[in-house]
């Protein structure tokens, strides 16, 4: 009997611990916590708060997404981030945004946001939006041409891309449920990492000759 009670008590303790670990970020305990980006303290899941007397009066507003980005890039696109690093007022609030502008034929290459779900709205033009499922869904590609005023949803951690299929410029605005969603660009990560992934790993994984890997690495030298 005592042995059974000990097992039950142990399982209850483990459930409590799992609940604490898996719960979402705690709600803020103050109206505002403007990030002290210059602070020396170690930050964990957020930044230290500035004293409100030093925060100014414009931390709730930003005009950084008002201007289109320069799409004269190798991908033909430009991402303008508006996360906690650019908008300290979002600290502890669990939200951020970005704007992506596309030249005709431009792409936001396959990438992952490891810390956030994404909701986007196409503001101009038409974009092919693709979301790749995991092995659980058979690596299925979910895709659709999304036009101005239409929206799309990308679950946290799934690889996705956008491609301008129109003949004119396109743009979109996306929203994240994290103040710092981060991003992993798949081509850049594979072929432009620092230090580089060993060539035999890539040739074996991609089932190609070493020369193909060298060519791809040359395209992403310097992290571009």
From Swiss-Prot:
Q: Which EC number(s) does UniProt give?
A: 1.2.3.4
Q: Which residue range or ranges hold the Cupin type-1 domain?
A: 63-214
Misc. comment: Associated mostly with highly substituted forms of glucuronogalactoarabinoxylans.
Cellular component per GO, a single term: apoplast
Q: Which cysteines are joined by disulfide bonds?
A: 33-49
Q: What is this protein called?
A: Oxalate oxidase GF-3.8
Q: What does this protein do?
A: Produces developmental and stress-related release of hydrogen peroxide in the apoplast. May play an important role in several aspects of plant growth and defense mechanisms.
User: Where on this protein are sugars attached?
Assistant: 70, 75
The record's comment on protein family reads: Belongs to the germin family.
Q: Where is the protein found, in the record's own terms?
A: Secreted, Extracellular space, Apoplast; Cytoplasm; Secreted, Cell wall
Q: Which UniProt keywords apply?
A: Apoplast, Cell wall, Cytoplasm, Disulfide bond, Glycoprotein, Manganese, Metal-binding, Oxidoreductase, Secreted, Signal
